[in-house]
Swiss-Prot record:
Keywords: Cytoplasm, Ribosome biogenesis
GO CC aspect terms: cytosol
Family: Belongs to the RimP family.
Gene: rimP
Entry protein name: Ribosome maturation factor RimP
Length: 155
């Protein structure tokens, strides 16, 4: 279950990212760390690579916005990075690009039990992730999805 502050932090970060020419690809609030850590992944809306200077510049702007919003009242660490090239899908663009590709989906059910499914990525919308498992579409509520990774068939 996500931290109660995460939706507000995500909304603020998306707004700041958009104003700076970035797209928010991922955000995590790691409350088990001391101090807590806010990890943010960004990419340029133009599709160009994010470099270290971009991350440093965005860190300053987002840090100021976080201080002004007073959403995080305790000490925290802010980490800014790019998603890089990896197997984990995170941005809407990733889910559009890799539609029809084989994926492993890790999710929690309503009883908070973790499950893993394999299938072909069908669609992700605001409410759910849909994968094709042997010709049948399985819909998983988006808030229950932990991770979606590209895989190779038969792996």
């Amino acid at each position: 279950m996500p931290h109660p502050l995460l939706p507000e932090l995500e909304q603020l970060t998306q707004r700041v990212a958009g104003l700076q020419g970035f797209e928010l690809c991922g955000i995590q609030l790691l409350t088990h760390m001391n101090p807590i850590t806010l990890q943010v992944q960004i990419r340029h809306t133009s599709g160009s690579d994010v470099n270290l200077d971009d991350c440093a510049g965005f860190s300053g702007v987002l840090g100021e916005a976080l201080e002004e919003s007073q959403q995080l009242v305790e000490a925290y660490v802010l980490e800014i990075s790019s998603p890089g090239i990896g197997e984990q899908l995170s941005c809407d663009r990733d889910f559009q690009t890799f539609r029809g590709f084989p994926v492993d989906v890790t999710h929690r059910d309503q009883g908070n039990v973790e499950h893993r499914l394999e299938g072909l990525l069908h669609e992700r919308n605001t409410d759910s992730l849909q994968i094709n498992i042997r010709g049948r579409i399985k819909s998983i509520p988006r808030d229950q999805v932990i991770e979606v990774r590209l895989t190779t068939p038969g792996q």
